Amino acid sequence: MAKALSNKPTNILIYMNHEHIQGNRNLLEIHYASREWASKHSGRHNREAYTKTRDLVIQLRGIRIRKWASCLLPRSSWIQGRCPLQVESEPDGTRIRPVARDVTGPKEGIQLRETDLTEIRHPELNPSRWSVCTQWDPERCHLRRKSV
């Protein structure tokens, strides 16, 4: 696993309504990490080079569906404001590459929107409708990121 911004691997577990009994297949596992990945892209940044990407991997335990949200960080910019994330997914979570978009965003702290957590209760799971919230919302403070 890649190293997080604090140079420590970070795993996050969010439990739905205290359903953390052993063997529960509906646990939502979230892995947040930062890694080095040099790239260039054509777009509004005029082929700037980027050296870091932040990955958010969302996976349901027992179901091989993963959701990756990656954000490339500019080499010389101070990270502030918002960071729209390009999200890609494949059934087994393989061959997923970061896609560059607007690259200014918060230095750290990614939280899932509370409304999106209810997706896993539906019989037909549609992870493409999940979204990532990069702004801290005090009303959703119970979804705080936890180190495990």
From Swiss-Prot:
Domain of life, source organism: Viruses
InterPro entries named among the record's database cross-references: Birna_VP5 (IPR004284)
Family: Belongs to the avibirnavirus/aquabirnavirus VP5 protein family.
Function: VP5 is not required for viral replication in vivo and its absence does not alter the virulence characteristics of the virus or the establishment of persistent IPNV infection.
Record-given protein name: Protein VP5
